[in-house]
Curated annotation (Swiss-Prot):
Residues 1-21 are annotated as: Disordered. Residues 1-19 have a biased composition (Polar residues). Belongs to the UPF0102 family. InterPro entries: Restrct_endonuc-II-like, tRNA_endonuc-like_dom_sf, UPF0102_YraN-like. This is UPF0102 protein YraN. Gene3D superfamilies: 3.40.1350.10. GO terms for molecular function: nucleic acid binding. SUPFAM superfamilies: Restriction endonuclease-like.
Length: 131
């Protein structure tokens, strides 16, 4: 868990959710700096959550944000398992349907923004519905 200084000067522990929210906000700012346009964050559908939904031109991008302190055990990008990919695909499918779309009618892709230590890696088209 990360720590943050408080007014009293003694650091306090961030919750896992607060840490995740902070890295997602960092990823959003970083991607906006690369020209992507923000659509939504922390989108919940039955059985899953998508960290960020952004747009690049006509492409809707579903983004999973991961953070790991070190590359031990494969680092942040390696933590997006097949099971997690399946949940993201299902969540995106439901979100698209709620917005009158589908994988057949909307140009979309699945990216991963992985923070490992001080390094950031943007994996475009990390997986798809044909994987």
């Amino acid at each position: 868990m990360a720590t943050v200084p408080t007014r009293s000067g003694s650091p306090r522990q961030l919750t896992t959710k607060q840490t995740g929210d902070a890295w997602e906000a960092q990823a959003r700012r970083w991607l906006e700096g690369k020209g992507l346009r923000f659509i939504a964050a922390n989108v919940n559908e039955r059985g899953g959550e998508i960290d960020l939904i952004m747009r690049e031109g006509r492409t809707t991008i579903f983004i999973e944000v991961r953070y790991r302190r070190s590359a031990l055990y494969g680092g942040a990008a390696a933590s997006v398992t097949r099971s997690k990919q399946h949940k993201l695909l299902q969540t995106a499918r439901l979100w698209l349907a709620r917005h009158n779309g589908s994988f057949d009618t909307v140009d979309c892709r699945f990216d991963v923004v992985a923070f490992t230590g001080n390094e950031v890696e943007w994996i475009k088209d990390a997986f798809n519905d044909h994987s």
